[in-house]
């Protein structure tokens, strides 16, 4: 046998043994899942950047059950009751949260002890009490100044600066993305939009809110039950986060459905999957129906709030979630005071941008490499605009899902 043939045969034999071990003799072999996902991480990587990831995850749970082996060392879960188990206070984040800059921030710190210390340092600035002091000053001006002064490609940023920039990014990108979803689902349902507008007019007439031409406060917006129901339903039905993985704790591991998960296993679930769980929200969980929040009993509402997942879960829940809610309530109330006409246009090829951060370990040093690209997939373009025939003056034109 020639050396080349021997080398090729040996390579294939090693690969075959590795595949057999991962598929049938791995500690996670007892959990069902797709074959490719159990033998290679490329399966998970591919679906992370695919625009239909959430639909694919839903199909996996339909086929394999509430716990699916998604990668050689990873599980995805569709069971709200397991959220407190997965996101316990000792759970460390995985390498999924690779730092965007070459240093860690409060958000990207993997070790829960380091996160607690970092969280305490900024809690006074973005916590619940700070929210009331800063309602009228929160905006994008600071973010614009920071990026003009420090280019991430030319200037090294120190840790406090990284923390500040990532905090601004969280408030200036994730929340508007959620706001777009709120307005989209309200505007595409005429009955919901009409009911919300009637609530705004009634609240204006009885003095609960100022005239619709004035600026509404967060406190006043929270007095509107149907507006609150629309926002909570949009957060359930169309969240912005894809998944939030955690490692099974060192030393103890986890127990999921009476099955042991060894330490170091990546366990994740998705706000989109939990929000569509029929055991939690009923058989119409796949429908956008804000009325469910008004019809729910106090026990049901408490249960839904307990498993609310759009700002994260557990000890690492977003510290500034009050700021995000403030933006959602205030802007949604202002925009929906002007009836919106929704135009949904089909595009043969819709471009979706993706951004992947790769964490590479070379010669003992960690390097962060970002990869950007575009996927061309069939899709729809949404343009929402104010009804020009409405009695209020002004014009609103929003491309909510820009390619």
Swiss-Prot record:
Assigned EC number: 1.-.-.-
Residues annotated to bind heme: 318
GO terms, molecular function: heme binding; iron ion binding; monooxygenase activity; oxidoreductase activity, acting on paired donors, with incorporation or reduction of molecular oxygen
Keywords: Glycoprotein, Heme, Iron, Metal-binding, Monooxygenase, Oxidoreductase, Signal
Pathways per UniProt: Mycotoxin biosynthesis
Glycan attachment residues as annotated in the record: 52, 92
Required cofactor names: heme
Enzyme class: oxidoreductase
The protein's name in its UniProt record: Cytochrome P450 monooxygenase ustC
Keyword Cell membrane included in the entry's annotation: no
Observed effect of gene inactivation: Impairs the production of ustiloxin B but accumulates intermediates such as ustiloxin F and C.
Record family assignment: Belongs to the cytochrome P450 family.
Signal peptide: 1-18
Function statement: Cytochrome P450 monooxygenase; part of the gene cluster that mediates the biosynthesis of the secondary metabolite ustiloxin B, an antimitotic tetrapeptide. First, ustA is processed by the subtilisin-like endoprotease Kex2 that is outside the ustiloxin B gene cluster, at the C-terminal side of Arg-Lys, after transfer to Golgi apparatus through the endoplasmic reticulum (ER). Cleavage by KEX2 generates 16 peptides YAIG-I to YAIG-XVI.
């Amino acid at each position: 046998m020639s050396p080349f043939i021997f080398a090729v045969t040996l390579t294939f034999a090693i690969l075959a043994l590795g595949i057999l071990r991962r598929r049938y003799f791995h500690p996670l072999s007892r959990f069902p899942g797709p074959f490719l996902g159990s033998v290679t991480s490329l399966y998970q990587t591919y679906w992370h950047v695919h625009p239909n990831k959430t639909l694919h995850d839903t199909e996996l749970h339909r086929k394999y059950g509430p716990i699916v082996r998604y990668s050689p060392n990873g599980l995805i879960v569709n069971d709200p009751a397991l959220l407190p188990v997965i996101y316990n206070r000792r759970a460390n984040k995985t390498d999924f949260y690779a730092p965007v800059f070459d240093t860690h921030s409060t958000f990207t710190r993997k070790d829960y002890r380091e996160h607690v210390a970092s969280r305490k340092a900024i809690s006074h600035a973005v916590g619940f009490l700070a929210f009331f002091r800063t309602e009228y000053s929160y905006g994008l001006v600071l973010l614009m100044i920071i990026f003009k002064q420090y280019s991430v490609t030319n200037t090294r940023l120190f840790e406090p600066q990284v923390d500040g920039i990532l905090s601004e990014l969280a408030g200036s990108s994730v929340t508007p993305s959620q706001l777009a979803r709120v307005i989209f689902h309200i505007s595409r349902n005429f009955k919901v939009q009409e009911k919300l507008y009637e609530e705004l007019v009634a609240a204006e007439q009885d003095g609960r809110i100022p005239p619709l031409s004035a600026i509404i406060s967060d406190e006043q917006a929270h007095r509107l039950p149907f507006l609150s129901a629309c926002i909570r339903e949009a957060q359930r039905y169309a969240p912005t986060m894809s998944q939030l993985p955690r490692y099974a704790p060192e030393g103890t591991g986890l127990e999921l459905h009476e099955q042991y998960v060894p330490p170091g296993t990546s366990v994740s679930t998705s706000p989109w999957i939990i929000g569509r769980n029929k055991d939690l929200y009923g058989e119409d969980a796949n429908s956008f129906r804000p009325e469910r929040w008004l019809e729910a009993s106090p026990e049901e509402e408490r249960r839904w709030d307990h498993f609310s997942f759009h700002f994260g879960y557990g000890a690492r829940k977003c510290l500034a979630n009050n700021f995000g809610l403030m933006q959602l309530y205030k802007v949604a109330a202002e925009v929906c005071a002007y009836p919106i006409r929704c135009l949904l246009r089909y595009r043969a090829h819709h471009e979706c941008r993706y951004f992947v951060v790769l964490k590479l370990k070379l010669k003992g040093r960690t390097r962060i490499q970002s990869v950007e690209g575009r996927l061309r997939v069939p899709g729809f373009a949404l343009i929402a605009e104010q009804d020009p025939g409405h009695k209020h003056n002004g014009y609103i034109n929003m491309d909510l899902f820009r390619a």
